[in-house]
């Protein structure tokens, strides 16, 4: 069993809290400034970015509350990868350096999530790093966009690889790196603008960190930071101690490539065993399917798999509705160990591609939650509906336009609450993009955006409802899709029913024929007037549907979420022609 790290020096709790507030404010300011300065909607609207301060040992001190955990969480891994590469080169950190990094085999979550790292010096001593990460619209992969690259055959087909590249060396801009970048990506104005916003936000973080140290002293800030990490570690250990010692196993499945003739590329197993030993917890992924060598649904162990596990454990064992706000730092992960055999989906071997790893990581989180449901049933939800991520693109005046959209998933029901409808799920929390923003910037028309009709999974607490979005092309273009959950429905829990699968289709302008498409769709041409429809999965139900309050069943009917027939058959609730509950008939039905 590992032990809690000792403090650098004794420090009073009031000072610790003051330093905590100061650090958290820095991360918030970084995130706010990054969102305000960015060009692309995936950052300024969807907030698919991360900001954090990291100490000299690579431990995360704070993270931006405005960012997605899948961006902020991997930042220590970015630092670890950068240091390893620089040590191999015999390179050093210097004042004025800005380092660009996106290698998924060196800590990055995947190639499009480009990080910018600024080493922070105080009195000529390296004391830490200020880091921003963000998802970029294009990094020069084989087809337009940075999602839906589902046919990448290896890491090289996924786009440019930046392995600890100094874009500023001791304050001097390396113009040649920027020239190479601009010449090898689509939509360079947007991408480079976003990158410059990241650098500016990271510089703000570095400056504010130094200001905190100048105000309170380096020893005080370091001691307070260690105390905060010890506190977070203790919170996690105390939560783990409440679990019975033992092993808890669950399995889940990914669609994979349902249109493939190769059985090794579809129906892919995710196997999770949780091992509890006192205040230590191990997540063992042995039994997970082998890596898919020439398809990019493999997951980097460091940057995706670890973050899916850490964030799921944090949200389940330290639910913020119970514990309130507490320090988000590297102390939380000290009690947790991850085992993932090499050569599997969860620990691929280079150069296996990884760019389309999002839904795979979400499946790891979902299966981990399923395993924990055996011991903390009141702290988990039923199965979640995965996301559909779409890249739209086209050409105008010899230039590319590229737009990325995140089609929401849905949560399963949980003890005491219905599942959340049409939201990002589990290890991410990005926001949707306003329709007005889409239609004012791109030749696209959103014809329909609403919740699915009559498809909520029955349960004492029903599953969340997925959304439907129909988008028409106003000019010739193309699109690609990275999705899952078109075959395997989200699981129901404790007599709750399974959710509903998603779907993808296109109605071509010329033939007017509706064509069903697979969940992994490589770049496909779309003529002007063609319309695509994305239907998001619905989360699983929790608990026996016959125990659902009749008033909630009526409310769902009035909202259009279920039909009278479903209310009767699934919930045993009779709704009259005057849209009221017939309690006598309902009670009789439920007795049967």
Curated annotation (Swiss-Prot):
Coiled-coil zones: none
Entry EC number(s): 3.5.2.-
Domain of life, per lineage: Bacteria
Amino-acid biosynthesis among keywords: yes
Matching InterPro entries: Hydantoinase_B, Oxoprolinase-like
GO biological process: amino acid biosynthetic process; glutathione metabolic process
GO molecular function annotations of the record: 5-oxoprolinase (ATP-hydrolyzing) activity; hydrolase activity, acting on carbon-nitrogen (but not peptide) bonds
Keywords linked to the UniProt accession: Amino-acid biosynthesis, Hydrolase, Plasmid
Short name of any one Pfam family annotated for the protein: Hydantoinase_B
Top class in the EC scheme: hydrolase
Record GO cellular component, one term: cytosol
Transmembrane annotation, as ranges: none
Family, similarity comment: Belongs to the HyuB family.
Assembly notes: May form a complex with HyuA.
Function as written in the Swiss-Prot or TrEMBL entry: Involved in the asymmetric conversion of racemic 5-substituted hydantoins to the corresponding L-amino acids. HyuA and HyuB are both required for the conversion of D- and L-5-substituted hydantoins to corresponding N-carbamoyl-D- and N-carbamoyl-L-amino acids, respectively.
Name of the protein in question: Putative D-/L-hydantoinase subunit B
């Amino acid at each position: 069993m590992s032990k809690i790290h000792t403090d650098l020096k004794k420090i009073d709790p009031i000072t610790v809290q003051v330093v905590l507030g100061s650090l958290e404010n820095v991360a918030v300011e970084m995130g706010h400034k990054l969102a305000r300065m960015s060009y692309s909607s995936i950052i300024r609207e969807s907030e698919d970015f991360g900001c954090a301060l990291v100490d000299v040992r690579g431990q995360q001190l704070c993270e931006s509350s405005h960012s997605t955990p899948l961006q902020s969480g991997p930042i220590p891994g970015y630092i670890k990868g950068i240091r390893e590469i620089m040590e191999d080169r015999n390179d050093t950190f210097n004042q004025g350096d800005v380092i660009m990094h996106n290698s998924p085999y060196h800590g990055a979550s995947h190639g499009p999530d480009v990080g910018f790292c600024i080493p922070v010096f105080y009195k000529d001593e390296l004391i830490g790093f200020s880091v921003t990460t963000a998802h970029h619209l294009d990094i020069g992969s084989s087809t337009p966009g940075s999602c839906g690259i589902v046919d990448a055959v290896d890491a090289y087909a996924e786009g440019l690889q930046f392995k600890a590249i100094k874009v500023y060396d001791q304050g001097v801009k390396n113009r040649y790196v920027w020239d190479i970048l601009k010449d090898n990506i689509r939509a360079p104005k947007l991408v480079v603008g976003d990158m410059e916003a990241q650098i500016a936000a990271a510089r703000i973080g570095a400056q504010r960190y130094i200001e905190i140290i100048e105000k309170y002293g380096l020893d005080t800030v370091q001691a307070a930071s260690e105390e905060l990490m010890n506190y977070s570690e203790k919170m996690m250990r105390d939560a783990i101690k409440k679990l019975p010692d033992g092993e808890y196993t669950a399995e889940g499945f990914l669609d994979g490539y349902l249109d493939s003739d190769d059985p090794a590329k579809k129906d892919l197993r995710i196997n999770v065993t949780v091992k509890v030993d006192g205040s230590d917890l191990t997540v063992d992924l042995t039994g997970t399917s082998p890596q898919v060598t020439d398809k990019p649904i493999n997951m980097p162990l460091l940057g995706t798999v670890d973050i899916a596990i850490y964030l799921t454990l944090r949200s389940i064992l330290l639910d913020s509705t119970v514990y309130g706000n507490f320090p988000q730092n590297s102390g939380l992960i000290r009690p947790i160990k991850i085992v993932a055999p090499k050569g599997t989906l969860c620990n691929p071997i280079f150069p296996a591609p990884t760019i389309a790893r999002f839904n795979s990581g979400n499946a790891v989180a979902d299966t981990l939650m399923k395993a924990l449901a055996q011991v903390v049933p009141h702290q988990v939800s039923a199965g979640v509906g995965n996301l559909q991520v779409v890249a739209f693109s086209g050409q105008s005046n010899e230039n590319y336009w590229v737009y990325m959209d995140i089609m929401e998933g849905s949560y399963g029901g949980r003890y005491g609450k219905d599942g959340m409808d049409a939201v990002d799920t589990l290890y991410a929390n990005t926001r949707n993009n306003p329709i007005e923003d889409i239609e004012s910037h791109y030749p696209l028309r959103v014809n329909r955006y609403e919740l699915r009709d009559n498809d909520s999974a029955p349960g004492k607490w029903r599953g969340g409802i997925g959304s439907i979005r129909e988008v028409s092309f106003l000019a010739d273009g193309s699109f690609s899709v990275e999705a899952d959950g078109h075959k395997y429905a989200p699981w129901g829990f404790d007599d709750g029913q399974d959710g509903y699968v998603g779907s993808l289709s296109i109605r071509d302008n010329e033939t007017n024929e509706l064509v069903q498409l697979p969940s992994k769709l490589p770049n496909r041409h779309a003529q002007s007037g063609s319309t695509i429809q994305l239907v998001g999965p619905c989360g699983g139900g929790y608990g026996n549907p016959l125990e659902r309050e009749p008033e909630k069943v009526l409310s769902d009917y009035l909202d259009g979420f279920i039909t009278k027939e479903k209310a009767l058959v699934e919930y045993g609730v009779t709704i009259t022609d005057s849209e009221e509950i017939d309690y006598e008939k309902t009670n009789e039905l439920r007795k049967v």
